[in-house]
């Protein structure tokens, strides 16, 4: 392989470190922040040089699709299969949860975290502390499978009567529904009707 410049070595080492520790490559923005480059076009230029020199392989059709190439075999290093899951921002009543207008970005996840049909999966960023006793903290990303039914005790994403999305534990009582927070300082939400958007099947947290 051809020799790298100092900056190219910094970028290559950072990508390799992230892939080894997280299982998926960093974004262009994250690379720039790590090596002190404010311009994304400059980062793209260095990535192109790394690819030309045989250190990485990229797929232009996918975000973050960077593979480290083994120096010994010149083949892409095998790493866990990564899928790109939509991160949902504002949840709008009457619009499918994964409609384009609801999607803020796509987030890479190791495929084993989903264990279901990838097209049914989305992510919500958790805001608040209503589920801390279930181990779901402010700033976490909950991995959600789209579905419209739930069983008692499921942790779900639901639309309230105020058209707000909330993550709570679901209970169907005789004449109403109870959305129970997992925080002993908070009261449950009681509703005559509830719209289930999905069931929480996993959690992702940056360390």
Curated annotation (Swiss-Prot):
Keyword RNA-binding listed: no
Alphabetical GO biological process terms: DNA repair; DNA replication; negative regulation of DNA-templated transcription; proteolysis; SOS response
Record key words, sorted: Autocatalytic cleavage, DNA damage, DNA repair, DNA replication, DNA-binding, Hydrolase, Repressor, SOS response, Transcription, Transcription regulation
Pfam annotation, one family: LexA_DNA_bind
Enzyme Commission code(s) on record: 3.4.21.88
DNA-binding region: 28-48
Class of enzymatic activity (EC top level): hydrolase
InterPro entries from the UniProt entry: ArsR-like_HTH, LexA, LexA-like, LexA/Signal_pep-like_sf, LexA_DNA-bd_dom, LexA_repressor, Peptidase_S24_LexA, Peptidase_S24_S26A/B/C
GO function terms (MF aspect): DNA binding; serine-type endopeptidase activity
Annotated site location: Cleavage: 93-94
Active site per the UniProt annotation: 130 (for autocatalytic cleavage activity), 168 (for autocatalytic cleavage activity)
Subunit (UniProt): Homodimer.
Function: Represses a number of genes involved in the response to DNA damage (SOS response), including recA and lexA. In the presence of single-stranded DNA, RecA interacts with LexA causing an autocatalytic cleavage which disrupts the DNA-binding part of LexA, leading to derepression of the SOS regulon and eventually DNA repair.
Family per record: Belongs to the peptidase S24 family.
Protein name: LexA repressor
Species whose genome carries this gene: Staphylococcus haemolyticus (strain JCSC1435)
């Amino acid at each position: 392989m051809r020799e790298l410049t100092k900056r190219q070595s910094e970028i290559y080492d950072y990508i390799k470190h992230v892939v080894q520790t997280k299982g998926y490559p960093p974004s262009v923005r994250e690379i720039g922040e790590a090596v002190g480059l404010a311009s994304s076009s400059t980062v793209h230029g260095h990535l192109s040089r790394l690819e030309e020199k045989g250190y990485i392989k990229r797929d232009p059709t996918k975000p973050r699709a960077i593979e480290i190439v083994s120096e010994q075999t010149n083949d892409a290093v095998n790493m866990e299969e990564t899928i790109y899951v939509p991160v949902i921002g504002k949840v709008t009543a009457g619009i499918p949860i994964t409609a384009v207008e609801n999607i803020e970005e796509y987030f890479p996840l190791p495929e084993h975290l989903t264990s279901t049909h990838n097209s049914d999966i989305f992510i919500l960023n958790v805001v608040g502390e209503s589920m801390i006793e279930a181990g779901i903290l402010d700033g976490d990303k909950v991995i959600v499978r789209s579905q419209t039914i739930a069983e008692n005790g499921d942790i779900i994403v639901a639309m309230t009567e105020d058209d707000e999305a909330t993550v709570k534990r679901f209970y169907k009582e005789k004449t109403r529904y109870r959305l129970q927070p997992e925080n002993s300082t908070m009261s449950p939400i009681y509703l005559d009707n509830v719209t289930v958007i999905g069931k929480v099947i996993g959690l992702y947290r940056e360390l």
